[in-house]
């Protein structure tokens, strides 16, 4: 496993908890809500939740913002644009777009763990335009074509 150094800036609304891995083999780090007051996410609605941090990722890395499984299974709270992407050249506050798919309103309290962040390396592509693609067994089959 490779460990990279990522610069992190604590913003004015920072609550004192840097993102951290919960276990030795956790892929994601928990992000906490840095809201001044409680935020209610009504059923079917979306709220943008601040985290109080900004980061400077190295070139060729991104941060992916993903749901916390416990919030999703217990309350129907998930990340609306999952996975949210934080690009290497973004320097603003990381915010999490949460949606309530549950059956009752949900309150986000200050300091609550709201999402997880995964740092991932990515590759850029150079398109090679062609009129013919190589054949595969699957072909054009999609959306359930391989079975349930």
From Swiss-Prot:
Catalytic reactions on record: dUTP + H2O = dUMP + diphosphate + H(+)
Top-level taxon: Bacteria
Protein's UniProt keywords contain Magnesium: yes
GO biological process entries: dUMP biosynthetic process; dUTP catabolic process
InterPro entries registered for this protein in UniProt: dUTPase, dUTPase-like, dUTPase-like_sf, dUTPase_trimeric
Residues that bind substrate: 68-70, 81, 85-87, 95
Keywords for the protein's UniProt record, in alphabetical order: Hydrolase, Magnesium, Metal-binding, Nucleotide metabolism
EC number: 3.6.1.23
Function comment: This enzyme is involved in nucleotide metabolism: it produces dUMP, the immediate precursor of thymidine nucleotides and it decreases the intracellular concentration of dUTP so that uracil cannot be incorporated into DNA.
Family: Belongs to the dUTPase family.
Name this protein carries in UniProt: Deoxyuridine 5'-triphosphate nucleotidohydrolase
């Amino acid at each position: 496993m490779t460990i990279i150094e990522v610069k992190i800036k604590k913003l004015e609304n920072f609550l004192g908890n840097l993102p951290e891995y919960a276990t030795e083999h956790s892929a994601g780090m928990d992000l906490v809500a840095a809201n001044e007051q409680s935020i209610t996410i009504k059923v079917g609605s979306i709220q943008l939740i601040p985290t109080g941090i900004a980061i400077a990722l190295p070139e060729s890395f991104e941060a992916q913002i993903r749901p916390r499984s416990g919030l999703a299974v217990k309350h129907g709270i998930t990340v609306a644009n999952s996975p949210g992407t934080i690009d290497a050249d973004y320097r603003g506050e990381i915010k999490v777009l949460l949606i309530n798919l549950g059956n009752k309103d949900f309150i986000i309290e200050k300091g609550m763990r709201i999402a997880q962040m995964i740092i991932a390396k990515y590759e850029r592509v150079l398109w090679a335009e062609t009129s013919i693609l190589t054949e595969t067994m699957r072909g054009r089959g999609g959306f359930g074509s391989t079975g349930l």
